[in-house]
């Protein structure tokens, strides 16, 4: 890691860089590898029928093309190719649902999300923190194992954060909730991963909120400004990549004193309150992780969770505001469950949260109706692969499944274009009560992925979103300004997020 930073900060002679660049260009011309899509001629390529296949068109109208491809190919069990405007060097293949079972159990050595991330977001050039086995273990095992103990701390952070960012008046006041939600989710995950010391650092919270946009912007600019054979130069020369390095370095400086306190046996957390830094220190045994390693783990989890959780929370809130009668019914459920659990000091437990069946069903239906991502289970083929039915995919092919189309397929969900707030509650009552909840994954609900590679943090996200909504619905009257309803989502490539700039009216209930 030290060598990494020395290299990042070195000041090479322009002449040396020029010579190396020319050498790379010559080598690229002489030994040009076979393009990945050369081995995909057996899979149809879908384009816009009107002939406008510009990059801007693909980014703007992705859902329309996915829908056309779903009706023509994937619903009939056939894959198709789409142009990959974000990563032209790697073709993307949209797969039908029949391949879900094989992909769900495929090892990382065959189909890799990490490789997909490196290709799609240029992680090797932007210096963005990467997923590691430690990160996955920390979230999938330690966080889920300690969920009960983490909820009290999470609720405390949510209450403090929302109270500081939302209006606190007896009169109706306008606000744009998104940044309050991003700040809140960042504080909550910081408390879980680093205790009070980390969640109390405003610099860290701001860094954790901003690093996602920083890394994505760096990757986009590098892709636009550097051809593939010259991208190695961007690691040292591109301002965005250098800004990511500076952020990572500063994050290590913030984390290091916390680590030293833990090693000295002192910490500013309640007895019995576990957190990610403790888990990392315990997991390393005799090998002590560096502050940079710990900070990178923390930043990666923030990149993976802060904005997705915030956008999902905002989307559910918008859907509730469009259905005030349903919202009142859910508030009634919240109050009834809270009354049954008054003996826990006003704090929500796992058991109490699990009894909020109407809220959970509404969240699941909102997640189906307005998914924040149009696709799921993105992977890159690590090796040439042949599926059981004979479908061949060459190495480095990117694959994905069209979540948005599964969600709106009448053969999967009856009356798919109707928002039914109790859809999933009725499914639980009619079948297995342990299925069909918000964090549940199946071949019909793949928003969180599937199988052994399903999102490991989905259970925490479910509890966190519930705690956020409980606080907002019970502490505030909330409504749209007169005459307004949920604005259209912002669709960009495979992203389908709620409008972050919409104004909502808040009034503090406790003071009104």
From Swiss-Prot:
It is an enzyme of class 1 (oxidoreductase). Its EC number is 1.-.-.-. Pathway: Secondary metabolite biosynthesis. Keywords: Glycoprotein, Iron, Membrane, Metal-binding, Monooxygenase, Oxidoreductase, Transmembrane, Transmembrane helix. Cytochrome P450 monooxygenase; part of the gene cluster that mediates the biosynthesis of chaetoglobosin A which has a unique inhibitory activity against actin polymerization in mammalian cells. Chaetoglobosin A and its intermediates are involved in the morphological differentiation of C.globosum. The first step of the pathway is the synthesis of prochaetoglobosin I via condensation of one acetyl-CoA, 8 malonyl-CoA, and a L-tryptophan molecule by the PKS-NRPS hybrid synthetase cheA, followed by reduction of backbone double bond to install desired geometry by the enoyl reductase cheB. Pfam families: p450. Gene3D superfamilies: Cytochrome P450. Its cofactor is heme. Glycans are attached at residues 53, 124, 168, 499, 508. Induction: Expression is positively regulated by the cluster-specific transcription factor cheR that binds directly to an asymmetric direct repeat present in the promoter. The chain crosses the membrane at residues 5-27. This is Cytochrome P450 monooxygenase cheE. Disruption phenotype: Impairs the production of chaetoglobosin A but leads to the accumulation of cytoglobosin D and chaetoglobosin J. One of its GO terms (cellular component) is membrane.
